UniProtKB/Swiss-Prot annotation:
Entry protein name: Protein NrdI
Biological-process GO terms, alphabetical: protein modification process
Highest taxon above the source species: Bacteria
InterPro entries: Flavoprotein-like_sf, RNR_Ib_NrdI_bac, RNR_NrdI
Origin organism lineage: Bacteria, Bacillati, Actinomycetota, Actinomycetes, Mycobacteriales
Length: 150
């Protein structure tokens, strides 16, 4: 599973659940800070938690599910242009709104929703994400035009 040179960007609140999941992946990743801004210069997959579950109808109102730091990050046109896919964390207690932030980002940014996991994820989630990312980046690379084909 070669994912070297492929970028992960994630946000984790003070609970650190998403951070712990990303650490278990063992893949270099850039963290969106709680305060301040960053800019990413290469294609990436975003991993984010879902906020506010259980308080709105997901079919009607997407407000509050995506952390404000992620919204600010994606409102930067440069960062948004590099986004290739999204993975979301959530809590199954919120039913249909489980990992709903991933649905919001996928829809608004027109990128694939690659995976969802609960809280800090399980060992099976870690293995599935590592394998899935390797396959995803391989597919992305296959669809890049080479200089010879231009």
């Amino acid at each position: 599973m070669d994912i070297a040179g492929r970028s992960l960007v994630y946000f984790s609140s003070v609970s650190e659940n998403t951070h712990r999941f990303v650490q278990k992946l063992g893949i270099p990743a850039t963290r969106i800070p709680l305060h301040g801004r960053i800019e990413v210069d290469e294609p990436y997959v975003l991993i984010l938690p879902t906020y506010g579950g259980g308080r709105a109808n997901p079919g009607l109102d997407a407000g509050g599910y995506v952390p404000k730091q992620v919204i600010a990050f994606l409102n930067n046109d440069h960062n948004r242009a590099q986004l290739r896919g999204v993975i979301a964390a959530g809590n199954t207690n919120f039913g249909a709104e489980f990992c709903y932030a991933g649905d919001v980002v996928s829809r608004k940014c027109s990128v694939p929703y690659l995976y969802r996991f609960e809280l800090m994820g399980t060992e099976d989630d870690v293995a599935a994400v590592r394998t899935g990312l390797a396959e995803f980046w391989k597919e992305q690379t296959c669809h890049q035009p080479s200089l010879q084909s231009l």
